[in-house]
Amino acid sequence: MAAPERASEAETGPAEADGPEGLALPPPPPPPPGPGPAPPSLAELPGELLELIACCGPLNASDVVRLACTCRRLREACQPRGKVWREQLRLRWPSLMKYYNQVDSVNWLEEYKQRHKAGLEARRIVASFSKRFFSDHVPCDGFTDIETLECPSHFFEDELMSILNMEGRKGLTWKYYAKKILYFMRQQNILKKLKVYLQRPADEQSFLEGAVLIDQYCNPLSDICLESVQAQVDDIVAKVRKFLKSKNSRHPSVTQKAGEVLIVSQVELQRQVLDAMNYVLYEQLKYKGNEVDYYNSLNSYIRQVLIHRTGIPISLSVLYLTIARQLGVRLEPVNFPSHFLLRWCQGTEGSTNIFDYAYIDAFGKGKQLTVKECEYLIGHHVTEEFYGVATAKEVLQRMVGNLLNIGKRESTDQSYQLLRDSLDLYLAMYPDNVQHLMLQARLYFHLGIWPEKVLDILQHIQALDPSQHGAVGYLVQHTLEHIERRKEEAGPDVKLHSEEKHKDVCYSVGLIMKHKRYGYNCVIYGWDPACMMGNEWIRNMNVHSLPHGSQQPFYNVLVEDGSCRYAAQENLEYNMEPREIPHPDIGRYFAEFAGTHYLANAELEFRYPEDLRLTLADVQKTPKHMHMLAQILPTSPNPKLQYQKRLGLKGKWPKQWTTEREREESHQHTPLLHLLALSEQVHKQTKMATTVGWPQVYDREHIPEFSGK
C-alpha cells in the first residue's frame, strides 16, 4: 500500500521548524487585514447630525458662513431658519432669546444681521453724543436719530445694555450717554403704554398696572415688569388663602379655581378674608407704613414696597386692594385728604350713604375706621365728597402728585430728574394743566436746557390762559436772550496752566480732592483763575470772608453726594486716599477711573490740554500710588508697562530715564525709588529683567517715610 503524498508547501505553508529540545516554534503572526470600507464623509451624515455638529462646535458666525459655502449638504444644514443660526444668535446675544418662542418660525440669519447692524448704529450714535452735547444737557430733540431707527428697538436696547455692562471703571463716557439714550427710549415706550391704559374703560384699568407704569417711568433702567410684580402679589394671595383655609376650609376664596373671577357677597365671609389679610400682611410678612422716612420716593414705587415691605398710605392701599379683589372682596379707593384710604361696603352695594362703609387704613395695619375716626385721623372735619370713590386715573394723579412734592422738597441735581419725570407723567394725564405746564417751563428755564421747548410750552400756556401773559412774557424774553447768547458763543474755551494769568492755579482736572471745612470727597472737572460767579452768589456764599476772597482760583467739582459745587482753592486739599466719586455726571467729563485719579474724556481734555500731565505728576506723590506700585512692580515682568497702564499714561512716561549712577544716588531720597530698584534686582535674578525706567525724583516734603517692614 503506497504511502500518502506529503502536501506541498504551497498548500500548507512552510513546515514548522523544530525548536530546541524538539519544541515547535509559534506560528508567525497573521498578515494585516486589508483596507475596509471608508468612513462616511461629513456631507454623507444625516442632516440632524450635521446641525448638531455645527451647533456644538466652537464656531462663530464667520465659520458658519464658510461652512455653508463648502457644499450643498452643509448649506442645507446651515439654512437661515435652522438651529445653527438660532444657536449663533443665542451664543452672541443670549439676552435676546426672551423675545422668541420655541415654536416661532424665524429667519435666524436675518435676525443675526439685524442685531449686528443695530449694534453698529447704536455705537455710532453713542459716540456722537459726547461731542454734540458736552456743553449742554441732551435735549429731547437730540434723540431724533433714535426715533427714526429702522432696526427693532429691542436690538438697539440690547446693544446699549452691553455698553452699560462694560468693565466698571472704563468707558465712563460711553456708559453715560448710553444710559441717557436707554432712559429716553424706555420712557417713550412707557408713555405710549400709559396713554393706552388711560383710554380703556374704567372697569378695565387695573390699579396695580397703573402703579407699575409709574414705577417703570421713574425707574426706566430697572428691571420692572407687571408680570414679576403680579407674581409677588400672587404669592401673598396664596399665603392668605392658606391661612384662611386653616380658619374656614369651606370658604369660597379657598376653593376658588385658578383664573376664576370670584365675588364674595356675604359680609361675614368678606370679614374673614380681611382678617386673614391683616394677619398675613402685617403680622406674618411684617408690612408697615414708613413713618421714619415718609418722604422717600421709594415709598411710592410698588416694586420697592414689595421688596422693603413698607410704603405710604396710597402705595400700601393699592397692594391691599389688589389682594382683596383677587380673593373676592371688592374694596374701593377713597381720595381722602392727607391720608389715602379704602372703603368696604357693609350695607347695600353701591350705597351713597357714607355711613354704610367701613374705611380701611392700609398704612395703619388694616385698621377699620368709622367716618368720625377718619376725621380724627387728619384732625379736621371734611365734607361727604371726600369719602367718594376715586377712579384709577385719580389714584395715579395722586401718586404722581406725591412724587412731584418730593421732587420740589429736595434740591440736588438728581431730584430734578424726579421732578422732570413726575411732571411728564402728570402732563401725560392732564396735558392742559396750566399750573404744571408753567412749572415745567420754569424748571427747564432754571436748568438752562432745551430753550426751544420752553418757548413751545409758554406759547401753549398763553393760548390756554391769557391772564398768564405777565409771567409768560418774562420767561419768553429771557429764553430768547439765552438762545441768542448760545448762537454767539465761539468754540470751547481752552485753558492752559502755562499762561501767566493762570500761574496761581495749583490743581488740575481729574484730581480727587477733599474739602477742608465740609470733608466731602470730590473730583475737579474745571477751574477758573478767579471766581467767575455773580456778585449775588459771592455775597450769598460769603466768599469775601475767605482769606484770599474771590481773587483766588475756583474749581468746578463733582461731589460724592451727587451735587456739583464751585470751591475756592484754599478750601481744597489733596485726598491722600483717593476713591471713586459716585456722581451721576462723572461720565460726562471723564472716560476712566485710573485708581488714583480720573482720566478726562476727549472733550474735557481739549479744554484743559495741559492738565493730564500735571495730574499724573501730582498723583505720584500719594501713599495710595506708592502702595499700588508696591503691589504691581515686584511681581511684574515689565514694571514700566504696568506702571504706565495703571496711571493711564497711554505709552508716555513722565520723565526721561536717569543714568545708572543717578539711579543709585536717588535711592536714599525716596522709598519709592528704592522699591523700584529692588524690583529690578528681583527680575534680574529670575532672568526676567527689563529696562526699567525711573520716574522723576519726588519732592521729599510730599513723601511720607515708610515705617516698619
PLM features per residue range, with description:
Residues 2-3, 9-11, 16-159, 167:
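Skp1-binding F-box subdomain of Cullin-RING ligase substrate receptors
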